[in-house]
Amino acid sequence: MKKNITKTIIASTVIAAGLLTQTNDAKAFFSYEWKGLEIAKNLADQAKKDDERIDKLMKESDKNLTPYKAETVNDLYLIVKKLSQGDVKKAVVRIKDGGPRDYYTFDLTRPLEENRKNIKVVKNGEIDSIYWD
């Protein structure tokens, strides 16, 4: 009888250790998945805010019959991305009265780099023309 109790205790310990290990793995996996969901949600929220902001800028320009204006390079990128149609990979935007630095080139197949997002656009930011490639 003593052997059976010892075997039962050892088996219970092994099973408990296995369950504990599985539980920790499940917690780690769940935590990892949860972080991924939070990141995806934040990106979706940011995209929605950007889209609403660009819609507002474009509607205001359409209402006043003025060229589209952008304050930052990110605004310019989002306007170009919204206006692009079909299989457009690159766009070159020319700013009105911008001088020698009046061209901005965007690769529309990738998101805009973080270090370019908050750069101010030259002059008043009015778009003179857009060349699609």
Swiss-Prot record:
Pfam short name (any one): FPRL1_inhibitor
UniProt key word Signal: yes
Name recorded for this polypeptide: FPRL1 inhibitory protein
Leader sequence residues: 1-28
Function: May be involved in countering the first line of host defense mechanisms. Impairs the leukocyte response to FPRL1 agonists by binding directly to host FPRL1.
TM helices/strands, residue ranges: none
Keyword set includes Signal: yes
Gene: flr
Cell compartment(s), UniProt: Secreted
GO CC, any one term: extracellular region
Species this chain originates from: Staphylococcus aureus (strain N315)
InterPro entries the UniProt entry points to: FLIPR, FLIPR/CHIP_sf, FLIPR/CHIPS
Top-level taxon in the UniProt lineage: Bacteria
